[in-house]
Amino acid sequence: MKRIFEVDPWTVTSHDLNPEDKRLQESMTSLGNEYMGMRGMFEEVYSGDTHQGIYVGGVWFPDKTRVGWWKNGYPLYFGKAINALNYVKADIYVDGNQVDLAKNDVTDFEVSLDMKNGVLNRTFTVFGVTFKITRLVSAAVKELADIHYDLSSADGQAHKIRFDASIDADVVNEDSNYDEKFWQVLDAGNDTDSSFIATQTIENPFGVPQFT
């Protein structure tokens, strides 16, 4: 495996923001608590190559096999662990400029997975603002994930921050055999303090139960 992280007994740390290593970086900074897990993809928009993935244990879909007529002995479907809703998605602007580390002039970048405490930390500076982002999935409450943002001015100037957070059910699996989207939205809503979305896996012709 290509080494892009520093050697340390308990932390997986990198200061490298190389687009060619982005997927490896995401894989190596994944989080999980035996109930759900997620890759170390960025919360904010990233227009470069990335592989977003959030998964819930036991939730899968029978993806119809795609083979030619000459193939014999293949199953009718392959059980696929499908991407769950993206609940970490955020669109962030500094003084009207969209935060996108694939395009921005980024300094002081660091991503570090604390293996002892199960916490992912990321720091970077763009547009005169330093971002410190902490993410975890709870070991005590299996359905709980937490993301904390700490923003500070790096240039001594005042900045206007726009933060659009969302729960995204329009997710895909890159390796789906027929480019299907496996979730359908049943209900959604929000108020001043919270938002929710209820989804269910789409119907399938194989008698596999649908997950909600």
Regions found by a protein language model. Give the residues of each.
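Beta-sandwich/jelly-roll carbohydrate-recognition scaffolds of carbohydrate-active enzymes
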Residues: 2-212
